[in-house]
Amino acid sequence: MSFASETKKELTQIEADNHCMKAEVSALIRMNGSLSFANKQLSLDVQTENAAIARRLYTIMKKLYPYNVELLVRKKMRLKKNNVYICRVREGARELLIDLEIISDDFQFNHTISRKLIKKNGQKRAYLRGAFLAGGSVNNPETSAYHLEIYSLYKEHGEALMDLMNEFELNAKTIERKKGFVTYLKEAEKISDFLNIVGAHQAMMKFEDVRILRDMRNSVNRIVNCETANLNKTIGAALRQVENIRFIENSIGLDQLPEKLREIARLRVEYQDVTLKELGEMVSSGTVSKSGVNHRLRKIDEIADALRRGEKIGG
């Protein structure tokens, strides 16, 4: 089961009061519902491929409304052969939709979120929960970039969803996609906050565990990469210095160098894998600082470069 499926399964098990259930079911119906007319009667179908969501929707609708609710199962023949679950309301469909402010008395559709249904904090959380159940997805934090999104068919609803999420300081954004609009979160911390807000506490804990491990792994990798780069730089410098010293030795002999340079040159050739600090501690006349050793080695590099250019070097 994917992380998104586990999250939705957890959300379908949350207990809520009637006000919160109404907010949740309004999101599910608004986003997954469709209307049809047959025999002069309006029929509402709410469709999902998730059995747990269908059961929850059916249970809530039966609890909140006196109308007959049918739960139908259809086989999806094309592509994925998942079952399709349909909650259907015939008699009372219009009254139910008016109560949820999805349509008005004169049958005008309202594509935004009814403020009446989200007066309190718990109702706002419930609406977001319903919206995620209806059209949400979240990437597996172990294998992908952090991303949570909720798909809306209408721009007004996508933007209303973004505004509602941002009441919880989630930094949500909305973008137009093919056949609709997506309200999304990209920051790991905000995704974790969203999971907590809608009540997916187990999913949030799993997400946080993975996030912490990933962040630690990334930090370790950065440190290792940095240390490797520094080590490669040090090794590269040492090899260049040894090459220059040997060039000088073959060209004019190390005896032509001043005594301080001659000693550091011989030490560098003999101890190629030690640091400049360690090299400075080997000087016979007394410890030379790291910067002092570096200065002498730079002088040796300059002499080697001068010899390559054919210049004469005095003793």
From Swiss-Prot:
InterPro entries reported in the protein's UniProt record: Homing_endonucl, Sporu_reg_WhiA_N_dom, Sporulation_regulator_WhiA, Sporulation_regulator_WhiA_C, WhiA_LAGLIDADG_dom
Annotated signal sequence is none
- Start-end of DNA-binding region: 275-309
- List residues traversing the bilayer: none
Q: Which PANTHER family match?
A: CELL DIVISION PROTEIN WHIA-RELATED
Q: Output this protein's name.
A: Probable cell division protein WhiA
What the protein does comes down to:
Involved in cell division and chromosome segregation.
Tell me where on the tree of life, at the top rank, the source sits: Bacteria
What UniProt keywords are attached to this protein's entry? Answer: Cell cycle, Cell division, DNA-binding
Q: Which GO terms describe its biological process?
A: cell division; regulation of sporulation
Which Pfam families does the record match to this protein?
HTH_WhiA (PF02650), LAGLIDADG_WhiA (PF14527), WhiA_N (PF10298)
Annotated gene: whiA
Task: List the molecular function annotations (GO) for this entry.
Answer: DNA binding
**Recorded family membership:** Belongs to the WhiA family.
